[in-house]
C-alpha cells in the first residue's frame, strides 16, 4: 500500500487513471474489495479503516458477513436524504452484529468570512438527533471549511498542517 504520514492507504482509485470511471457490478466490486482487504500486505496494524460508499449495498453486507469487524462508524451529512442512508447503515450493521461505534456529522455548518457566524445550510444537528434516537454515541461534527479543502487537495492532513487549528481539534475530539 501507499504510505503517507505513517498511514497506509489503498484505493481502487490508485488502480485506474483519474478520468477512468469504475463502472463495476457487484461481483467486480466484491472481488476488488476482497483483494484490497486480504491481498494487500498491510503489515502490523493498530486499525484498518475501510471507507465505503453510503447505504447498505453488496460491499457493506459482504464485508460485514465475511470479516470480523470490531465496529462501524457512520458518517452522514445533516440533511434528511443523507440521514436515510445513515439509518439504513446503522440498522444493517446492528442486524449483522457489527457494533456501531458512533455517528459523525460532516458538513454540519460553515462559518461566514464576513459575519463570522455559523450557517447551517443542510439542516441542524440531524446526525446528533439520529444518534440519540438509536442510542449510539454522537462522535462530533465537522464544518464545511475552505482551508480544510485546500489542505486535503494539497495532501496536507489538517492535524499535521495546523495541529492547534479548530479542524485538527475537532478531528482529535472525534478520534
Question: Model segments located where?
Answer:
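Predominant activation on well-ordered alpha-helical scaffold segments within soluble catalytic domains
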Residues: 30, 34-38, 61-64, 87-90, ...
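Conserved catalytic-core segment of NTP-binding enzymes
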Residues: 46-47, 53-151
Amino acid at each position: 500500500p501507499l504510505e503517507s504520514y505513517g498511514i497506509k492507504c489503498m484505493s481502487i482509485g490508485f488502480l485506474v487513471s483519474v478520468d477512468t470511471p469504475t463502472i463495476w457490478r457487484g461481483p467486480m466490486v466484491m472481488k476488488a474489495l476482497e483483494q484490497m482487504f486480504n491481498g494487500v500486505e498491510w503489515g502490523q496494524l493498530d486499525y484498518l479503516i475501510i471507507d465505503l460508499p453510503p447505504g447498505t449495498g453488496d460491499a457493506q453486507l459482504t464485508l460485514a458477513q465475511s470479516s470480523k469487524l470490531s465496529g462501524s462508524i457512520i458518517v452522514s451529512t445533516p440533511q434528511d436524504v443523507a440521514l436515510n442512508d445513515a439509518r439504513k447503515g446503522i440498522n444493517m450493521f446492528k442486524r449483522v452484529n457489527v457494533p456501531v461505534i458512533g455517528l459523525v456529522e460532516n458538513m454540519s455548518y460553515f462559518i461566514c468570512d464576513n459575519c463570522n457566524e455559523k450557517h447551517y445550510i443542510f439542516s441542524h444537528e440531524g446526525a446528533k438527533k439520529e444518534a440519540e434516537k438509536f442510542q449510539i454515541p454522537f462522535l462530533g461534527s465537522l464544518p464545511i471549511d475552505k482551508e480544510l479543502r485546500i489542505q486535503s487537495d494539497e495532501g496536507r492532513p489538517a492535524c499535521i498542517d495546523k495541529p492547534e487549528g479548530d479542524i485538527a481539534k475537532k478531528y482529535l475530539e472525534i478520534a
